Every structure is written in structure tokens, then in C-alpha cells.
Amino acid sequence: MKNTSIKTVVAIGIGAALFVIIGLFVPITIFTNTTISLQYAVQALFSVLFGPVAGFFIGFIGHMLKDMFAGYGVWWSWVLPSGLVGLGIGSLKNRLKVDKGIFSKKDILSFNLVQALVNLISWAIVAPLGDILIYQEPANKVFTQGLFAAFANTFTIGIGGTLLLIAYANSRPKAGSLRKD
């Protein structure tokens, strides 16, 4: 993080704090240790705006702190995938131009294809394998939880993240839209 800008470091701090607050106070529990997690929509917004490094650390630090404050201990096998989701979505930073007021239907499709793939890899593969390797959890249980998390987070980011990005893009002036009178 030697060349990381102050703006990115501040974004990581704010994003991780929002991740913790939303994760602790707005979870929709489905079954044991598995919730619909609205904080991933905010992480997606920050990841697109500030890039993969910010996205990774927002998810990693935010999830770690959320687990610590929740009192059930840090589940590292799920902390890492939260970071990977931000890393993957953050890879779209230079491709999407939401900071310039542009978020077209093609951009929405690209965003949602990438986030769906990243969620599937992170939650349906990485998290369950981590649970098995680190915690010796039963495979059928963790792959069920992982698949649910992948679909729930894809749905959450697909709706919430897309709406946040549309709102953000609409709040930015488009290039060439301002003229001197």
C-alpha cells in the first residue's frame, strides 16, 4: 500500500466502518451464520469508485471487525472472500466511468456479470473450502451456506449496488455538459 493515495486510505476507513455498521445493524438472517448482507452493495460502490485495493481492504477489514464485534469470533474463511469480492468488483474501476456521470445499460450488464462471477467464486468455492480446511466443517453444510451466500450477495449487489452506482453516476456532471454563459 506504499503508493496508495490518502483518498484511497480514507475510503478504506469509511467503507470498512460502513461495512461493519450495516453488517451489524441491518442483517437479514436466513439460517445459522448466513444472512442477506446489505453492506456488500456499499462495498461494491466503493470498489468501483476507489479500485481493487480499496475494495479488498473494505471487505477484509470490515468483515473482520464485524465478526469481532458480533462476538462469535472471526471466521477467516469468510473474511477473505469479502475482500476478494471487493478486489474483483474493484477491477472495474478503470472500465466504468461512474465518476464522469456515465453508467450505461452495457455498463450495468458488465458490472453485474463481473459481480456475479466474483460472488460465485468467493462464496461458493473459496469460503466453503476455507471452512473445511481451517475449521473442519462438514462439506455439505458449508457448500450449502456458500451457495446461498453467493446467490444472496449477487442479488443484493445486483439490486443495491446497481442502484447506488446509478444514483452516483446521475449525481456527477457528464463531460461537456457544463458551459460558460
Curated annotation (Swiss-Prot):
Give the keywords, sorted.
Cell membrane, Membrane, Transmembrane, Transmembrane helix
Membrane-spanning ranges: 11-31, 45-65, 69-89, 114-134, 147-167
Subcellular location per UniProt equals: Cell membrane
InterPro entries in the cross-refs? ECF_substrate-spec-like (IPR009825), UPF0397 (IPR022914)
- What is this entry's stated membrane topology? Multi-pass membrane protein
According to the UniProt record, one GO cellular component term is: plasma membrane
Family label: Belongs to the UPF0397 family.
Record's HAMAP family?
UPF0397
Name of this chain's protein: UPF0397 protein SUB0313
- This protein's species is Streptococcus uberis (strain ATCC BAA-854 / 0140J)
Q: What is the lineage of its organism?
A: Bacteria, Bacillati, Bacillota, Bacilli, Lactobacillales
